[in-house]
C-alpha cells in the first residue's frame, strides 16, 4: 500500500510490476515505482509498449502524387491506400486522419481511405491541389509533402492519438514491426463531439427557430435546478448548486443552445461522382434532406441543403455501408462549406423537415472560384508575416462577420469578410499571407463601418459590437 499524502494513516493499494527475483521489500521503494501512463497494451495487459515511438518511414518509391490537373484538387488532402498491405492497414477503421513519414524527411497528412484500383507498384496515392512540377519532397517553400519538425517527440508538429495512434503488425518473417500509420483520429472519434448549437450558427437563423432552441435550453436548466433542489443531503446539494451556478456562468459566455433532433458532427470524405444536390450519409434516412454546417460559420450562404442518397455505388465502395461518423460529398459542395477540404474537416449534419426549418441561401457570387491557398500561398518565407495566433485572428474575423450580418451588411461586403476568414483559418497551416488578404478585402474599413463606436468619454473603439459577438468579452461591474 502507498501512503496517502493528504490522509495520514490511509493507504492506496496498487499492483507493482517487477522483474523476476525482486525481493518483497523492494516493491516499497516508492521513489522508483512509476506509473504506466507512458505505455500502452495491445493484448489486454499481457505486454506493454511505449505509448509513442519514433515513426517508421515509408520509401517514397511506393507512392504517387495526384496533382490538381490530374483530379487531385477534387480530393485535396485524401491519402488513398492499397487494401491488404500490412504496414498500411487501418485496423478496424474504414477511414482515419493520419500522418505517414516518408524517406525520413517529409510526411503526408490527411484522411486515409482504401482504394481497390491503385496502379501496379503503387501502395499510396496522395491527392493535392498543387500543380504539376511541384516536387513531392522539396524544400519548405516548394513541396507537396511537408518537412518534418526537428522534434523527436513530435516530428509531425501535431500529436497523434494517445491510445491506439500507433500499432504493430507481424511481417513475412514473423517479426513484429511498427506500422507506417500514425492516427490523429479514427472512425468513431468525430461523432462523439458536443452537439449543441453554436450562437455563430443560430444567430443567423430565423427568430422562431432561435426562440424554440433557447427555450428548450432554458427548460433543461430549470429541470436540472429543480432536481438539485429536491436533494435532501445539504452537503451534496451545496456542491451541486455551486457546480450548477458555474455551468450557468459558462453558458452565458458560450451561448450554446439545445441540439436539434438527430444532429451530429460527421467528418467529410470526397465522392467526386456525387451530385451537387446529394450527400452519402448512412446515419440518416435515404431520401430525407439534411443541412450541412461547418464552423467557423459565416452565414446562410455556406449551408448546402442536400438529399441523402445512400445507394451511390462509389460512396458505398469508399466509405462502406455503415460508417460511424462520415458523410460523402463532392468538391463543389465542400467549397460552399467555407472552402472545406478533405484532410479531416467536419460538418454538423442537421436533418430538416416540417418541424425543423433551416434557412439557407445560394453561395455568394464573391466566393465563386476563390481558393485561399492559390491566392495567398506559395510565397517565400521572410516576404510576409507568418500567422502565429490563428484562434485570436479567427475570433476577430468571426465576430466581424456576425456583427455585419446582424447589422445588415450587403452581400459584397460580407463576401470580403468571408474571403478573409477563409485565408485566416488556413494561414498558419498552409503559410498564407493573411496580411495581404486583410488589405485586399478592406478589413480595416469594414471594422470601422460595422464595429466602430465611441464610448461615453468620446473615445473611439473597434471590436465586437453586438450581444452575440460580445458574449465572451470581459466587462467591469460597478461595486454596489
Sequence positions of predicted segments:
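Core mixed alpha/beta domains of very large multi-subunit molecular machines
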Residues: 2-350, 354-367, 461-480
Amino acid at each position: 500500500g502507498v501512503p496517502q499524502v493528504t490522509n495520514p494513516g490511509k493507504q492506496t493499494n496498487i499492483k507493482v510490476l517487477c522483474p523476476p527475483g525482486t525481493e518483497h521489500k523492494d516493491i516499497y521503494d516508492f521513489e522508483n515505482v512509476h506509473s504506466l501512463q507512458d505505455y500502452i497494451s495491445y493484448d489486454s495487459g499481457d505486454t506493454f509498449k511505449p505509448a509513442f515511438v519514433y515513426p517508421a518511414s515509408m520509401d517514397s518509391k511506393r507512392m504517387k502524387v495526384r496533382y490538381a490537373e490530374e483530379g487531385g484538387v477534387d480530393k485535396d488532402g485524401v491519402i488513398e491506400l492499397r487494401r491488404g498491405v500490412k504496414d498500411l492497414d487501418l485496423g478496424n477503421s474504414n477511414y482515419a486522419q493520419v500522418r505517414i513519414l516518408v524517406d525520413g524527411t517529409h510526411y503526408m497528412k490527411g484522411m486515409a481511405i482504401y482504394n481497390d484500383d491503385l496502379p501496379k507498384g503503387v501502395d499510396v496515392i496522395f491527392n493535392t491541389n498543387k500543380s504539376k512540377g511541384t516536387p513531392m519532397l522539396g524544400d519548405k517553400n516548394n513541396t507537396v509533402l511537408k518537412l518534418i519538425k526537428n522534434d523527436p517527440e513530435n516530428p509531425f508538429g501535431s500529436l497523434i492519438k494517445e491510445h491506439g495512434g500507433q500499432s504493430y503488425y507481424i511481417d513475412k518473417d514473423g517479426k513484429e514491426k511498427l506500422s507506417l500509420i500514425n492516427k490523429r483520429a479514427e472512425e468513431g472519434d468525430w461523432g462523439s463531439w458536443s452537439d449543441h448549437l453554436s450562437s455563430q450558427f443560430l444567430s443567423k437563423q430565423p427568430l422562431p427557430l432561435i426562440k424554440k432552441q433557447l427555450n428548450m435550453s432554458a427548460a433543461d436548466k430549470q429541470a436540472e435546478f429543480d432536481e438539485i433542489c429536491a436533494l435532501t443531503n445539504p452537503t451534496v446539494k451545496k456542491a451541486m448548486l455551486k457546480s450548477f451556478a458555474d455551468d450557468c456562468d459558462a453558458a452565458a459566455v458560450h451561448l450554446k443552445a439545445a441540439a436539434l433532433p438527430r444532429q451530429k458532427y460527421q467528418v467529410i470524405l470526397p465522392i467526386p461522382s456525387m451530385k451537387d444536390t446529394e450527400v452519402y450519409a448512412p446515419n440518416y434516412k435515404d431520401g430525407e434532406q439534411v443541412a450541412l454546417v461547418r464552423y467557423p460559420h459565416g452565414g446562410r450562404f455556406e449551408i448546402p441543403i442536400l438529399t441523402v442518397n445512400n445507394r451511390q455505388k462509389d460512396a458505398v465502395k469508399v466509405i462502406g455501408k455503415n460508417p460511424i461518423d462520415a458523410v460523402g460529398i463532392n468538391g463543389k459542395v465542400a467549397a460552399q462549406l467555407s472552402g472545406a477540404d478533405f484532410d479531416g474537416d467536419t460538418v454538423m449534419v442537421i436533418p430538416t423537415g416540417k418541424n425543423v426549418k433551416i434557412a439557407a441561401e445560394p453561395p455568394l457570387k464573391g466566393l465563386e472560384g476563390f481558393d485561399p491557398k492559390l491566392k495567398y500561398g506559395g510565397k517565400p518565407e521572410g516576404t510576409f508575416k507568418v500567422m502565429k495566433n490563428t484562434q485570436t485572428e479567427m475570433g476577430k474575423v468571426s465576430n466581424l462577420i456576425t456583427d455585419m450580418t446582424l447589422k445588415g451588411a450587403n452581400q459584397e461586403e460580407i463576401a470580403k469578410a468571408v474571403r478573409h476568414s477563409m485565408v485566416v483559418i488556413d494561414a498558419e497551416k498552409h503559410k498564407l499571407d493573411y496580411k495581404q488578404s486583410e488589405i485586399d478585402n478592406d478589413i480595416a474599413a469594414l471594422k470601422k463601418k460595422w464595429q466602430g463606436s465611441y464610448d461615453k468619454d468620446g473615445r473611439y473603439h473597434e471590436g465586437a459590437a453586438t450581444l452575440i459577438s460580445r458574449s465572451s468579452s470581459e466587462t467591469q461591474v460597478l461595486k454596489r
